[in-house]
Amino acid sequence: ANHAQAQMLSGHIQGKVLEFISTISRPKYILEIGTFTGYSALCLAKGLQPDGELHTIELRTEDANTCAKNFEQSELHKKIHLHVGNAVDIIPALPYTWDIVFIDADKTGYITYYEMVLPRLSENGLIIADNVLFHGQVLDEKVSGKNAVAINAFNEHVAADERTEQVMLTVR
């Protein structure tokens, strides 16, 4: 991993878990919020139906350029649509009902993204949120730091949401 922020990469085991979830779900439409290098998008895309599509949103142009190159090297590149910009602006413009949504972007935006995609989730759809333990920091008696506080608020928000069932898995 020659990226300055390589610690943010999804690991091999996490990639296999995403691939497994996608494969058993057989989604037609997947939304990924936060692409980074594109690894998790490629893992998720492996389970798409033959006519399925994965739409992934990346805010940072430099990372989007890396993703585009990585996607082009994959046999799945025709199924993956990369959108560059702010997810809050892009999500409403995508006219799909999502079978899987993978949230792995700015931690302070998780609740916003969750609320944006939930009404457009298919009946048996899945929302997968990465980093919900935030390096164990949300388990501290006093949660501190902008991102840890945001993830803790997201966890509490989802746990209190009667519209969904929740499962927390620790995968790295």
Regions found by a protein language model. Give the residues of each.
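S-adenosylmethionine/decaboxylated-SAM
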Residues: 11-172
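Rossmann-like AdoMet
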Residues: 1-9
